Each structure stands twice: as structure tokens, then as C-alpha cells.
């Protein structure tokens, strides 16, 4: 496992140093995310989507479908990510629901996560750095 992560970090550094435009968002967030996943071996859709969420929380039109989100969609193989086409079906559904409610998809996903954690505010995770 460590060799996969080391290889992923190496390729990330290499791409960052030589191909900066790869890391610039495009108008199609999902296509951009998928290109990043292809260019960064060992880093899948969920991890890349999470990084995009952290950098562009109100603009991103892709979301991190981690095991908790997948479980909400009825995914039972929680130790395995779905294939890209299934990932995009779930993601497109979430994007549609968020758009219908006028809430950025990353924000709605974070609200959903807070509910799973039985938290009223997203600040609970930051308590260790606030104190």
C-alpha cells in the first residue's frame, strides 16, 4: 500500500512541477476531475474530488463520494469504489438535487456529512485548532 501512495505522491509532484495547467479548473468540473485522476495514479475520484471541494467549496460541480455517501446511495461494497460510470450516476444525481434546491453541491454534501455525524454545525471538526 505504501508503494502505491508513494508512487501517487511522486506523480503528483511531477505533474505539479511540469504541467501546472492540469491543475487549473475547466468549465466541466467532472471532466477536469477525471483528467486529474488519470494523471495521478493511485489517487481516485473520491480523493481528487475531496481536494477540489476543499479548494473550490462553492464553485465545484463534483463531489467526494466516500464510503458514507456511497452507503446513502445503497452501495454495499464499501471497501471498493464504484466504476467511473456508476460514480458519475450517483454524482449527477446529487448535483441535480443540489441545483434544484439552490445549494452548492459541496455545501449540501457537507451538511449531509454533519447530519451523519449528528452535528448541527461544520465547526465541530475544527475544534482542535480553535482551542
Residue spans of the language-model regions?
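C-terminal accessory module of base-excision DNA glycosylases/AP lyases that mediates lesion recognition
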Residues: 11-131
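Non-catalytic DNA-binding core/recognition domains of DNA-processing enzymes
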Residues: 1-12
Amino acid at each position: 500500500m505504501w508503494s502505491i501512495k508513494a508512487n501517487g505522491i511522486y506523480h503528483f509532484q511531477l505533474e505539479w512541477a511540469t504541467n501546472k495547467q492540469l491543475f487549473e479548473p475547466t468549465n466541466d468540473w467532472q471532466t477536469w476531475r477525471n483528467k486529474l485522476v488519470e494523471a495521478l495514479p493511485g489517487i481516485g475520484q473520491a480523493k481528487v474530488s475531496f481536494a477540489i471541494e476543499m479548494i473550490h467549496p462553492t464553485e465545484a460541480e463534483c463531489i467526494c463520494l466516500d464510503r458514507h455517501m456511497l452507503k446513502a446511495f445503497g452501495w454495499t461494497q464499501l471497501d471498493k469504489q464504484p466504476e467511473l460510470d456508476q460514480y458519475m450516476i450517483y454524482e449527477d444525481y446529487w448535483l441535480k438535487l443540489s441545483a434544484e434546491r439552490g445549494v452548492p453541491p459541496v455545501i449540501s454534501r457537507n451538511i449531509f456529512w454533519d447530519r451523519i455525524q449528528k452535528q448541527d454545525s461544520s465547526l465541530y471538526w475544527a475544534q482542535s485548532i480553535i482551542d
